């Protein structure tokens, strides 16, 4: 359950920036790119999601809040970085280029890359201090497993237009579903260990 909350936390961070004590590390630009990336994903729609209902799949992203998190600040930062990197890797491929409008895809990849650069510049020293920490390995592995499932799905579906549409909707759902967790973080004042 803690791993799934870690994944949800990353989605909150990607969509809305870090709340409370984590927010001081991110620039306004980082948060603007997060919102812009979500809008770009929405604009990338080429097919009606209804035409691809037979291709839907549950990739294991939890739909509701998990209570009682023990997620630490450094875990949240690591998960955010991994989510951004995996998203970038997913959309920055030759097969992805064939599926999407290249202008929108390039803007999305640029926005994700700018977020990664911003995180690296601001959080490099913080992440370097505990980079080998075992506490982050579980949440990071959960993110990698989630994206590995997405890559396997695309390969099984032979990178069809419907498969890419399912993935686009999945990424939209993942980013959009983080609103409740964001509100919880605001109520806790950024303390992820609060009840």
UniProtKB/Swiss-Prot annotation:
Keywords: Antiviral defense, Cytokine, Disulfide bond, Hormone, Pregnancy, Secreted, Signal
Biological processes, Gene Ontology terms: defense response to virus; female pregnancy
Cystine crosslinks: 52-162, 87-109
A molecular function GO annotation: hormone activity
Entry's Gene Ontology cellular component terms: extracellular space
Superkingdom classification of source: Eukaryota
Main localization category: secreted
Subcellular location: Secreted
Signal peptide: 1-23
Family of the protein in this entry: Belongs to the alpha/beta interferon family. IFN-alphaII subfamily.
Function: Paracrine hormone primarily responsible for maternal recognition of pregnancy. Interacts with endometrial receptors, probably type I interferon receptors, and blocks estrogen receptor expression, preventing the estrogen-induced increase in oxytocin receptor expression in the endometrium. This results in the suppression of the pulsatile endometrial release of the luteolytic hormone prostaglandin F2-alpha, hindering the regression of the corpus luteum (luteolysis) and therefore a return to ovarian cyclicity.
Protein name listed in UniProt: Interferon tau
